[in-house]
Each structure stands twice: as structure tokens, then as C-alpha cells.
């Protein structure tokens, strides 16, 4: 039988980071020694107190349907955290839970964009691999905002103005940034706020790495700027801050009218989250010491890993101020990012993500996670150094 599929879905490319991980697993299964730096996941387990809270909830029978918005104690806890830590003026009624930050982004874009109308969504380039496919799946048109390695990918009004049009509906931004590790300064946030107001745009601010910052850096939430707050949908979750990737716990914080409308999609596509997972998340909000310990461990690994990369001929890597990614530009006999990633995997046994997966701004760049065991990171540096020197000398 010939199956017919929705073109907006069938045209979506596979996730490059997941594809690389699968290839690395297959190589390992075939007996090859591969170090994986491609995963976007903390290498810590969920804090004990959060796990215990989830187990206790299951034992007490908290395994039934619950509110589609999410249990109120969790939404109140998230709102309190956003007020105190992110400067966002909100209440529990501004919070909507979702099965992961990725779905929170999809259902928000799906709610705001009219398919078939040619409505455009601006995304940072380079930017996370799933933004453009999500926009396309929702019926929108993704448009890249080109940022440069030379300027360390800092966002500018000029870059935004180059691509905005009368069809632009939404700007998706992500700080701290995956893949570059760049953070958003207060001046840059103010610039974006003015841009959104001048063009009457909404902002979707993905802040899933907001707790992972270094060297006293601050990554500002646009929703903390009062004059633009009613234009901002903030997306966050528990995957990165509390090492809860498998629990699938995300949320949006937005004006009540937007939350109410997105909830309609929630009700008809996923009903509600698991109550025991949400009770674990409620406890995770109290795990700030555990989060701080994770971040300090990432900082230590960042310091030696980035220094090691910059010691390799032909490799340049800015020191990331946030996330747990190193974004390196590699000059290797004219190879593009896919060819570089393939070479490192085949010749060095090191799995990385090619920069082209993050947009044209990723040409000749690769993303590597340093949320990996220190011994593996040091061995990966040794292998990459040897493989790159074979060509660069």
C-alpha cells in the first residue's frame, strides 16, 4: 500500500544529535571503542530527594489523571522560583506543564501560528536542531537570524532587522544558548525587547539551561523586562537543572490568555502529566545545592576541555558562559562540519555533532558536550589532537 503523509511532517529531517548517538551506539555494538560527546544530557542521576518523592507518590497511589495544567502546588512552586530567580512577575495561573520542554515549544508554536498563511518564525542561526522542524511541523516558515563566530554569536538589532518582515509572527531565542554556550546580557535583552515592541512580535524564550552559567555570568530573561513581558512566552523544564531528562517535565510561563489557549491543545493531545513525576519535580525545586554542585563540576570540566581544544592546531573554541557544550571551529583541509564530524568518529572514535545541523552559522563547527566523565573527556582530547594533527601537522 502507498501511504500518504502530511508534507510538513514528511519533509522534516531526522535529529542530527540523535542520529549521531545511534551511529555511535551501533559502532560500539560492533566492537569499536567510541567516546560520545554528542548527547545533550547531564551525566548525573536525578537528585535522591526528587527520586524518593516520585517513588513515594507511586506508593501512595498517585497514578491517576490530574489537572491538564499541572498540579497546583508545582505550578505555584515554579511561579515562586521564576519570581525570585528570574525576575518574572507571574503566578500559578501563568504556568502550564507539558511533557518536556520540546513539546512545550511545539504546542506553543502550534497555537500561535496559522498553517498555510506563510507566517514566519525567526530562529537564531546557529540554533538548536529542533526549532526549524517544529516550526515547519506547526505550519510556519522558519527564518534564520545569522549570527557569527567572530562576534561569539551575540545577538544584534542589525541581525534581527535583516530578516524581519510583515509576515513575521514570532522570535524563538535560546539563552544560555545551545549550541554556542553564549548568554544573554541585560543590554541585549533590552535590545530584543525594543525590537519585539517595534515590530509587534511575540518572543518564545527557551531558558532550559538558565541554571547552568559560569564565572558570575547572568543570562537575562526577556520576561523580566516589564515593558515587553506580555509579549513573552518563557519555556523551561527540569531536564537540565535537575538531571530529569527521562521524567519529561517542561512548562511554559506566559500571559493568561496564551496559557488558556495552549491548554486547549494540551487537553486534546496529552491530557495531563503523571502526578508522581510532578511531585518529584516539586521536590526538585528544593535541590538548589545539588544543582550548584552539578554546575561546579561542569565548570571544572569546561575549563580543561576548552583549553585542550584550543591547544590543537586549527581549532578555535570560545569559552562558553553557559550550558555544558563546547562549540569549536575547526580548520581541517577544507572539510565542512559533517565531514569533520565523520572524520573524528571514524578516525578518532569520538562522536560529535556537526555544526551544519544547527544552521548555516555552524559551517566548519562541531558541538561537543562536556557533561561527560572527566577521563573520557581527556581521552577524547588526546584522540582528536592526534587525528587533527595528522592533517594539520
List PLM regions with ranges:
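PLP-dependent class I/II
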Residues: 2-5, 13-15, 20-34, 41-57, ...
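A glycine-/small-polar-enriched, mobile loop at the entrance of the PLP active site in fold-type I
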Residues: 38-41, 56-75
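Substrate/cofactor-recognition hotspot
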Residues: 9
